[in-house]
Amino acid sequence: MHQSEFDPHSKEVVARAPLDPHLKALENEAIHIFREVAGEFDNPVMLYSIGKDSSVLLHLARKAFYPGRVPFPLLHIDTGWKFKEMIAFRDEMAKRYDLDLVVHTNPRGKTEGVTPFSHGSALYTDIMKTEALRQALDAGKYDAAFGGARRDEEASRAKERIYSFRTPDHKWDPRNQRPELWNVYNGMIRRGESVRAFPLSNWTEVDIWRYIQAENIPLVPLYFAEKRPFIERDGMMILAEDERLELLPGEKVQHGSIRFRTLGCFPLTGALRSEARTLDDVIAELEIATVSERQGRAIDRDQSGSMEKKKREGYF
């Protein structure tokens, strides 16, 4: 048996082997959430960070509204410090799928010269990501924002609802969230409030990768192992391909087979040594992994309880 599905690289309908029941159930839930939010809210937007979860989210959004266009814009908060491969991939996807892409950079951060090196990861993230996101959401007057967060990623995300309610200044109070009964979501909001909606809440990292494999979803190549230059700093392997990266005393550029489990700003994202060059290799590697994928993100450990503090202030 085969089912008719659209080719992720075009709008053509092709024969594709059916998903296994577990992935199909997750897909159905995510598509239901997309359609519920699109039907309930006046002005939704999808937060697009270009990583593997965003790629799956985009694929599901296209499925949810196929054969029409994705009926809401994609919002990318560009800090100016993303991997160059990410920006090239973002622009390619927007062109390929005829997406309404909104890109925002915090003008205050640009004027003040805020960088991960000059201001440290905590202040840099607050200005260039959290503050920038609040600016963009206010400018677009969006009342709902889709995000690709999953409950298995990190402790504070584990307690977040699928509909995560935010105050008029985009803050999150985990003690003041509404109950969710099965797949019944309450989208009623007060004036000025908004919702972050998370269609991938119940997916695991391995689910994401198996779905990418089953659906042939394109990804940024940094997720796959390749011989690359890097330096070791603060317990992380930092990619050394950007001329803005200045070596500290005692540091030297090394070369080795590395890849990334998660993608963010290059100075704050650590690689891992790996030989996983294919989807099968990546999945096999993850099935025996003993640490979280976000162990390689400096912003998750720059202060005690850092992710929850960031989310309370309006972070993704």
UniProtKB/Swiss-Prot annotation:
MF-aspect GO terms: ATP binding; sulfate adenylyltransferase (ATP) activity
UniProt xrefs under InterPro entries: PAPS_reduct_dom, Rossmann-like_a/b/a_fold, SO4_adenylTrfase_ssu, Sulfate_adenylyltrnsfr_sub2
Acyltransferase is among the record's keywords: no
EC number(s) per entry: 2.7.7.4
Residue ranges, annotated region (Disordered): 297-316
Gene Ontology biological process terms, A to Z: hydrogen sulfide biosynthetic process; sulfate assimilation
EC main group: transferase
Biochemical pathway: Sulfur metabolism; hydrogen sulfide biosynthesis; sulfite from sulfate: step 1/3
Keyword Iron (UniProt): no
Catalytic activity: sulfate + ATP + H(+) = adenosine 5'-phosphosulfate + diphosphate
Signal peptide (UniProt feature, chain positions): none
Keywords of the record: ATP-binding, Nucleotide-binding, Nucleotidyltransferase, Transferase
Quaternary structure (record): Heterodimer composed of CysD, the smaller subunit, and CysN.
Biological function: With CysN forms the ATP sulfurylase (ATPS) that catalyzes the adenylation of sulfate producing adenosine 5'-phosphosulfate (APS) and diphosphate, the first enzymatic step in sulfur assimilation pathway. APS synthesis involves the formation of a high-energy phosphoric-sulfuric acid anhydride bond driven by GTP hydrolysis by CysN coupled to ATP hydrolysis by CysD.
Family recorded in the similarity comment: Belongs to the PAPS reductase family. CysD subfamily.
The protein's name: Sulfate adenylyltransferase subunit 2
